[in-house]
Structures are given as C-alpha cells and as structure tokens.
C-alpha cells in the first residue's frame, strides 16, 4: 500500500475526551473515530490491526475443532423470555419492536440464540460434543461508556459455546479453550493473568477470566506472591480468620445477653467510639432485597421470607463489623439475579426498627444469612431491633441460627491466601476473555434435549467462552507504546515494514519503489510513504502508527539503507541488496517469538 492511497487522518494534539493511552493513540494515529458516545468506527489502518486480531482468534478456534456460525444480531425477544433473562438483564438489554409489534433484542450475548438454533438439531447423543463460535457485533446499552474501545455500547465479540452429554466432555472442552486463549493472547503480544471469577448474569460455574493489568481497570484482582493464586475480587476467597472475641474472652466463658442504651449510635464507626472497642467485635446486619433467588422462598426454621409477586425476597445479611459484603458472592450463593440494599422503609417493615439497629437475635420476619466470619465470633455486639438499643455478649448458634452460612466477605489486600496462607496483594485489571461452565442453565430453561444411549431424554450441558476483540485491540496498544506512539507487535501491525524515502524523487524514489516491490514479492506487508511531505512529518507519523520496521532511503546513505526497529533506539545501515533479506528474517523471528 502507498501512503497517497491511504486514508490516515493523524492528529498532533490529544483529543480532550481521551483519558487512557490506547484511546489517545488510536485517535491520534487515525485508526478510530467515534460517531457518538460509546459508538466507534474503525478507519483503514485500525481495521487492518483489528482484522489481524480476528484472524488469530479464528485460527486458534479452528485448531481445536470449533465451528464458526453467523447468527443474526437481532433476535426474537421470546427466546430471552424463555431463558428468563428478559427481565433479569435490566436496562442494558436493548429491546426493540418491529412493525408487527413483535419484541426483539439487539444481542448483547448469544447463549439464547445458539441454544434456540441447535435445540431441535442436536437430538441424539451421537451429535455430541459440538463446539461452536461466532465473531459478531453486539450491543449493550452501557450507562457510562468510557476509555475508548475499553467500554463501548457497540462492540465485537468472539462467543463460543460447547454442548456436551457428560461432565468429562465439558471438562475437556474447557481445558481446550483455556489453552487456546493462552495462545491467542501470546500471539497478540499480551501479558495476561488468569484469575478465578464469578459467572454473574451468565450463570454456571468453573469460571476463569483472563485479565490485563491496567491502572484504570474495572476489576480488582487478588494475587498471591507465593503460590500464584489469582482471583477477581468478586470471586476471591481467603483463609478463615481465627475465632474472634471481645477482649479475648474464651468461648467457654460466654455471658448472658445484655441490652444497653446506645442513643443515636447507628453506624459501626459510632459504635466503635461509643463502646471503645474494635469493629471486629460487632456483627453488622444489613437488609437486602434479593430477586429471583433459586434457594430462597420459605426460609428454614419456620421463618417466611418477605416475598412479593415479582420474586423479590428481603433477607438479613450478617457479617463481622470490620468486613464488607461482597454482593457478587451474595448473588452467586443465593443463585439470584440481583441483590441490592433495601430502602429505609423496607428495613423498618422487615425489622420493626429504623436503619442502624437491626440484628439477628429475635428477627422473625425474614431469614438470616451469615458470612462465615460470624460463626467464628463470640461475645459479640449487635443491634437489638429497637431504636437506640444494642445487645452485648451475643453468641452465634446459641442466640440465633442463620438459615444459610456462606463466604460473603470482600477479600482485601493483606488477607491470607486460601491456598498457602501468604498475604494477598491487589492489582487493577481489565477483562479480555472469560471461560466458564454453564451447565444446564440454558438447556433446561429452553427445553433443549437429546436421546441418550438408552433412549432416555436428557438435557445437554454447555460451556461458554468469550473474547472482546475491541478491548483486546486497545489492550495491545496499552501494553505496547511509548511517548512517540504505538509499537505494534509484528503479529498485529497494520503493515510489517514502512519504506520512507527522504524525498520521493530521483534515485531515492527509484530505490524505494524497488524495495517496495521486492517486499511485496516475498509476502512482506509493506507501506511506502510516497507523500511530498517533510522528513520530520514522515518520521513522526511512522512512530505514531507503530509499524515494526522502518527502512529510510536517503540520498547520502545510498547504496545503504537505514534499518530501524520501532521498539529499538538505534538504527543501522544495511546494503540495499541485503536489506530485504534482513526484513524477511526479522519478520519471521518476531512472529516466532509470539508463537
């Protein structure tokens, strides 16, 4: 390609709306432009890099026997109603109607589409396992798109789905995708961290995310420096604490409950100051509104959960006072679509008192769900279910019995690793890929069945495996850039070599054209800068757009050509008859490093 044929509207100034480096550089390099908030267009150079990412993903999917499909982006709303996600997805799901007043969905993901497409086709155990994928446009009505390609409303995803008749087959597919993802990210030149993760609204289990470190990352990662344990904050676990008392009183010396006056003492901070003791001595009780829980309804011990026709349940969540509830863990533990703090009015209706004085002792209207930390406490302090009153000397199990006990705490830096006991540390990260075992969530909801070897109807299990191509492309720029511009890995670069004559005339033009034609003959992707521009402008543009190799044709250096790697500081002079050999060798070596 010649520069005079290329559309490359580079910018010298950083656009005001750009915050992260990838957004700044992709805009300045003339690779993307935004039409509206969260809606981006790829320009020719950016699209060439994007297509390289797409090609790598296709090659690795094909290598594990995964078959590409092309379902529609707009799908019937009824299949989302069938799966149960029509309501649970919330306002991020873009719902539209056609002229026949039929409900449609602009797909944010494709579990429903693939299940509906294949449910009547995979009717025998002989049809399994089947590995499928799509690379398609998606839409999610994000409340706050930001950071350029990192979080958009319209985006491109590789979604893969596997269908199985047994757990062993699903486990094998999961491992195949895990290995394929590691290859994909390596070939793209990315350093990723595999972390245990929550499946969220997708459902299922056996979940792993592939993250890149980022100062503006959406996720907090908990990492162990000793054993390599890594998890998203939403999923992270830690070693249990020792038994927690008040003043180190031994368990055997438990005292009877005592009610005390605590006028206007509503928060843990207030209580700490009032009682002059540590917050770890308190049992914090929070009232949550839980939606569509699969395990809540009529609670244990004769207590009926406060429930309405919208499948909404009020519960009390108890946790040690110095800890915070992890709402992702809460939703996952209760198999619920959502869990949010109740309103002040709901708290009063459920507990009979105002916010700040709830507690588990004597709570009759709603079930108590406890974090594991609570069951290791004794001689604790809780709200007394009365305004301006608290209880002392509370003993879990003796004074109240939770309906369920789960790991609900938010793990923090300094907590002990659940595997080896070493203190964990945190990093911010962005998710590039996610793999997880869906199980029967969609096949049961949408009644997908097959006949097994005995002629009995069964539901197949599913795996789900996603990669965001736009975020992946932006993440490559985040990891590979300097103050002058992008430094594309050889595997992703729009072109592998840039040929830059000081002036496109005379002997310099002749030699530049010869090098260009020779590169093309050898299958080397070359960009010839044939513009009538100043040398400084040409060099600035080439540094900005990040082509890995630059050949400079100057009259003073002929018959030698200046050879420079974009990632290197120094350049060298190479005989014009040998320089294409060096380019070819370098391209092969750089690609080999990424394989």
From Swiss-Prot:
ATP-binding listed as a keyword: yes
A GO biological-process term: prolyl-tRNA aminoacylation
CDD domains on file: ProRS-INS, ProRS_anticodon_short, ProRS_core_prok
Chief site of localization: cytoplasm
Gene3D superfamilies in alphabetical order: Anticodon-binding domain (3.40.50.800), Bira Bifunctional Protein, Domain 2 (3.30.930.10)
Catalytic function, reaction form: tRNA(Pro) + L-proline + ATP = L-prolyl-tRNA(Pro) + AMP + diphosphate
InterPro entries in UniProt: aa-tRNA-synt_IIb (IPR002314), aa-tRNA-synth_II (IPR006195), aa-tRNA-synth_II/BPL/LPL (IPR045864), Anticodon-bd (IPR004154), Anticodon-bd_dom_sf (IPR036621), Pro-tRNA-ligase_IIa (IPR002316), Pro-tRNA-synth_IIa_bac-type (IPR004500), Pro-tRNA-Synthase_IIa_type1 (IPR023717)
Keywords (A to Z) from UniProt: Aminoacyl-tRNA synthetase, ATP-binding, Cytoplasm, Ligase, Nucleotide-binding, Protein biosynthesis
Keyword Nucleotide-binding: yes
GO cellular component: cytosol
Subcellular location: Cytoplasm
This enzyme's EC code(s): 6.1.1.15
Enzyme class: ligase
One Gene Ontology molecular-function label: ATP binding
SUPFAM superfamilies linked to this entry: Class II aaRS ABD-related, Class II aaRS and biotin synthetases, YbaK/ProRS associated domain
Pfam families on file: HGTP_anticodon, tRNA-synt_2b, tRNA_edit
Source species, domain of life: Bacteria
Protein task: Catalyzes the attachment of proline to tRNA(Pro) in a two-step reaction: proline is first activated by ATP to form Pro-AMP and then transferred to the acceptor end of tRNA(Pro). As ProRS can inadvertently accommodate and process non-cognate amino acids such as alanine and cysteine, to avoid such errors it has two additional distinct editing activities against alanine. One activity is designated as 'pretransfer' editing and involves the tRNA(Pro)-independent hydrolysis of activated Ala-AMP.
Description of its domains: Consists of three domains: the N-terminal catalytic domain, the editing domain and the C-terminal anticodon-binding domain.
Family: Belongs to the class-II aminoacyl-tRNA synthetase family. ProS type 1 subfamily.
Subunit record text: Homodimer.
NCBIfam families: PRK09194.1 (NF006625), proS_fam_II (TIGR00409)
Name under which the protein is recorded: Proline--tRNA ligase
Naturally occurring in which organism (per UniProt): Treponema denticola (strain ATCC 35405 / DSM 14222 / CIP 103919 / JCM 8153 / KCTC 15104)
Lineage, uppermost ranks: Bacteria, Pseudomonadati, Spirochaetota, Spirochaetia, Spirochaetales
């Amino acid at each position: 390609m010649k520069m005079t044929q290329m559309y490359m509207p580079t910018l010298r100034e950083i656009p005001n709306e750009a915050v992260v480096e990838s957004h700044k550089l992709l805009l300045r390099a003339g690779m993307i432009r935004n039409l509206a908030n969260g809606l981006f267009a790829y320009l020719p150079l950016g699209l060439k890099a994007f297509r390289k990412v797409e090609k790598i993903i296709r090659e690795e999917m094909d290598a594990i026997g995964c078959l590409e499909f092309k379902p529609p982006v707009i799908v019937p709303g009824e299949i989302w109603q069938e799966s149960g996600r029509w309501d649970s997805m919330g306002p991020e799901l873009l719902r539209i109607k056609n002229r026949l007043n039929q409900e449609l969905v602009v797909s944010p993901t494709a579990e429903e589409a693939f299940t509906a497409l294949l449910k009547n086709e995979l009717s025998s155990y002989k049809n399994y396992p089947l590995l499928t994928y799509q690379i398609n446009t998606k839409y999610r009505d994000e409340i706050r798109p930001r950071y350029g390609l990192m979080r958009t409303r319209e985006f491109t995803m590789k979604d893969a789905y596997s269908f199985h008749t047994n757990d062993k087959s699903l486990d094998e597919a999961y491992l195949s995708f895990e290995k394929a993802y590691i290859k994909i990210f390596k070939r793209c030149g990315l350093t990723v961290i595999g972390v245990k993760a929550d499946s969220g609204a997708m459902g299922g289990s056996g979940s792993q995310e592939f993250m890149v470190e980022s100062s503006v990352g959406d996720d907090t990662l908990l990492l162990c420096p000793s054993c390599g344990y890594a998890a998203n904050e939403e999923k992270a676990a830690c070693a249990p604490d020792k038994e927690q008392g008040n003043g180190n009183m031994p368990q055997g010396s438990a005292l009877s409950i005592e009610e005390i006056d605590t006028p206007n003492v509503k928060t843990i901070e207030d209580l700490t100051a009032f009682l002059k003791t540590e917050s770890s001595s308190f049992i914090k009780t929070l009232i949550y509104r839980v939606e569509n829980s699969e395990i809540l309804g009529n609670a244990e011990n004769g207590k009926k959960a406060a429930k309405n026709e919208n499948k909404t349940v009020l519960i009390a969540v108890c946790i040690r006072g110095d800890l915070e509830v992890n709402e992702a863990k809460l939703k996952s533990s209760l198999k619920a679509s959502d869990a949010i703090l109740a309103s002040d009015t709901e708290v009063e209706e459920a507990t009979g008192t105002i916010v700040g004085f709830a507690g588990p002792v004597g709570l009759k209207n709603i079930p108590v769900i406890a974090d594991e930390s609570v069951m290791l406490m004794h001689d604790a302090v809780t709200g007394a279910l009365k305004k301006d009153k608290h209880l002392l000397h509370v003993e879990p199990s003796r004074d109240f019995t939770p309906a369920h006990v789960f790991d609900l705490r938010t793990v923090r830096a300094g907590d002990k690793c659940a595997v080896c006991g070493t203190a964990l540390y945190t990093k911010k990260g962005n998710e590039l890929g996610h793999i997880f075992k869906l199980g029967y969530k969609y096949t049961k909801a949408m009644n997908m069945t097959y006949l097994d070897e005995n002629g009995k109807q069964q539901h197949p299990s599913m795996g789900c495996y996603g990669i965001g191509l736009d975020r992946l492309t932006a993440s490559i720029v985040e990891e590979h850039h300097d103050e002058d511009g992008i430094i594309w890995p050889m595997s992703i670069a729009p072109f592998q070599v840039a040929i830059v004559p000081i002036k496109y005339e005379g002997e310099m033009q002749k030699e530049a054209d010869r090098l260009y034609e020779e590169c093309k003959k050898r299958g080397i992707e070359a960009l010839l800068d044939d513009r009538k521009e100043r040398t400084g402008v040409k060099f600035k543009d080439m540094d900005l757009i990040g082509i890995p190799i630059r050949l400079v044709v100057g009259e003073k250096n002929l018959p030698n050509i200046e050879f420079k790697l974009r990632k290197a500081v120094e350049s060298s002079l190479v005989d014009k008859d040998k320089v294409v050999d060096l380019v070819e060798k370098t391209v092969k070596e750089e690609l080999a490093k990424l394989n």
